[in-house]
């Protein structure tokens, strides 16, 4: 499923970043979630339609999909720098951004650090502000060390991203209607989760041990960009999460897509595109 259609790699300091570029017009950068197996394929149902009016850049984050799976400790700041450098060196101008899930925290911090790079921002089911405040403790650090042990860590990681567990992830957490799960999408997640061999476990170990968490409240309050949140109707605690974001920054607008969960742009691409056209 994860075809490499061209040689579009951004040579970055921590590894090569795979991306695609489609269409012409004002730029939009699409950034996928950080769940195990996530990649730019997450946007496959909407990127061609967006490319009619925009230049659409879709990236595979470092450690994900077709990008390098570097054996580093992944932190929020690593992705903040990656996104900012990508905009500066590849897009080359101020850009709109749509970020899914946990990646919304990267975009928020990147915009806070270098606001001249960002225009409008759309966050799709962003992470809980309370969750983001949780920092690694001793138990988390031990977990990370265990997951990075060559044989043991690889075995545990492969159990976590087994075919059955990926399918269960979609059925239980990603889709409003489990009978409508897109098999091609779950296949792409499974492929991405195993691409890169045993190095794939390093991103998961950093995620599981909370190394990617960061308190974004101060950044969110300071932003004066137009920010729009798209929430899946049945996303767990979705209303509480968006209420917290709006309390931090009252200028934020929110739209709820009916009969969707964690991936509204996959479950209801037409309804999602309507929101994109309204906002951008």
Which stretches of residues belong to each language-model region?
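Active-site loop/oxyanion-hole signature of alpha/beta-hydrolase fold enzymes
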Residues: 58-98, 274
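Flexible "cap/lid" loop of the alpha/beta hydrolase fold
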Residues: 112, 120-154
């Amino acid at each position: 499923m994860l075809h490499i259609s061209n040689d579009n790699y951004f040579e970055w300091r921590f590894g090569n970043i795979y991306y695609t570029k489609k269409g012409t017009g004002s730029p939009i950068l699409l950034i996928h979630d950080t769940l195990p197996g996530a990649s730019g394929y997450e946007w496959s149902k909407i990127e061609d339609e967006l490319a009619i009016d925009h230049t659409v850049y879709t990236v595979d984050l470092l450690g994900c999909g077709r990008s390098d799976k570097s054996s580093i400790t992944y932190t929020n700041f690593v992705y903040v720098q990656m996104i900012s450098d990508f905009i500066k060196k590849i897009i080359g101008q101020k850009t709109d951004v749509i970020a899914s899930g946990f990646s919304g925290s990267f975009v928020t911090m990147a915009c806070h650090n270098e606001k001249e790079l960002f225009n409008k921002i759309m966050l799709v089911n962003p992470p809980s502000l309370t969750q983001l405040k949780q920092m690694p403790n001793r138990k988390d650090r031990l977990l990370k060390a265990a997951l990075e042990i060559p044989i043991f860590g690889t075995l545990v990681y492969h159990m976590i991203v087994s075919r059955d567990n990926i399918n269960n992830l979609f059925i239980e957490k990603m889709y409003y209607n489990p009978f409508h799960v897109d098999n091609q999408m779950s296949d792409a997640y499974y492929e991405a989760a195993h691409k890169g061999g045993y190095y794939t476990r390093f991103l998961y170990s950093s995620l599981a041990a909370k190394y990617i968490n960061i308190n974004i409240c101060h950044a969110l309050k300071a932003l004066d960009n137009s920010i729009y949140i798209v929430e899946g109707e049945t996303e767990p605690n979705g209303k509480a999460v968006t209420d917290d974001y709006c309390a931090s920054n009252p200028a934020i607008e929110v739209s709820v897509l009916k009969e969707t969960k964690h991936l509204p742009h996959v479950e209801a691409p037409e309804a999602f595109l309507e929101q994109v056209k309204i906002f951008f």
